[in-house]
From Swiss-Prot:
Catalyzes the base-exchange of a guanine (G) residue with the queuine precursor 7-aminomethyl-7-deazaguanine (PreQ1) at position 34 (anticodon wobble position) in tRNAs with GU(N) anticodons (tRNA-Asp, -Asn, -His and -Tyr). Catalysis occurs through a double-displacement mechanism. The nucleophile active site attacks the C1' of nucleotide 34 to detach the guanine base from the RNA, forming a covalent enzyme-RNA intermediate. The proton acceptor active site deprotonates the incoming PreQ1, allowing a nucleophilic attack on the C1' of the ribose to form the product. Binds 1 zinc ion per subunit. This is Queuine tRNA-ribosyltransferase. The gene is tgt. Its EC number is 2.4.2.29. Its cofactor is Zn(2+). Zn(2+) binds at C305, C307, C310, H336. It comes from Natranaerobius thermophilus (strain ATCC BAA-1301 / DSM 18059 / JW/NM-WN-LF). GO terms for cellular component: cytosol.
Amino acid sequence: MAISYQLEQTSSESRARLGKLKTPRGEIQTPVFMPVGTQATVKTMTPEELKNLDAEIILGNTYHLHLRPGNDIVREADGLHKFMNWDRPILTDSGGFQVFSLGKLRQISEQGVEFRSHIDGSKLFMTPEKSIEIQEDLGSDIMMVFDECPPYPAEYDYVKESMDRTIRWSKRCLQHQKHPEKQALFGIVQGGMYPELRKESALKTTELDFPGYAVGGLSVGEPKEMMLEVLNTTIPYLPEEKPRYLMGVGTPDYIIEAVRMGIDMFDCVYPTRVARNGTAMTRFGNLTVRNAVFQRDFQPIEEDCDCYVCQNYSRAYLRHLIKANEILGFRLLTWHNLFFLIKLIKELRQAIADDNFLAWRDSFYKNYQN
């Protein structure tokens, strides 16, 4: 078995839980946030800096790395870890979400998806088998099944057909996997915003006995209340002894609520993307540093933050860098945002360990506005 999960503690007042995910490249404390390294880099950060921020695992993107530089080149480099000089665990997504969100003029069949590259318009065909082959070339520690991610909103019949297809594709991924002892393969629960389809997907996916399970197809434009309601009805059908991963979620309030419901793993481009838009994440909510109000503001992003950025630079300087389109500005805001989110997860874990998660959550929300 490539990974093993150990449930260590469950909150007495919610479904929040602490665990350890053991992989060939190290142990991960859960809950955990995974910074996204789409193109074999977490934008503007070096692997060494990510380690200093205590990032335990990062995410790589199958679709993007297949198109550029090509999974054959990554394989020749002896895998993604060597290629990007990262010796901690890596999770790769299956490329499914990107095929459905970025791929132009896509055509879905039982075999797979035909689409056009968002880079040069060339015609490509992705199948469950192809996705697994690419992820095996990349050499990630955790792979994901190739799934169909339906849009929001979508009609019941379409989502049902899509969900059934994802189950069939999941079986094909399992059958095509060559080295389950080296690389874990997680299943993905779909079903759109329909609780009965989510239940059906969860039950059928868990029958396939994956070492971990993701909840996909959420945070795709639906209202927050709907997303949390669907998540809450899905999680009870996932086994307690396996890790649970909520795909594409990375704001503090969503993470806290999902942890309360029993989610262990998160990934999102949010902290790095908003940094490049000139926004800093804080425990009081987002701070749009590029705004004119910070032109003469010489205090740090957060007074009590002990990250490198807050210890050394002012809001005024960061605003100047962002307005001047200087790379350092985007880099420093990315640094702060990742530090903030990883530290938040550490505090959250400590609150679960102390069995006062709900009190900690209420205290956080008193200040936080988003």
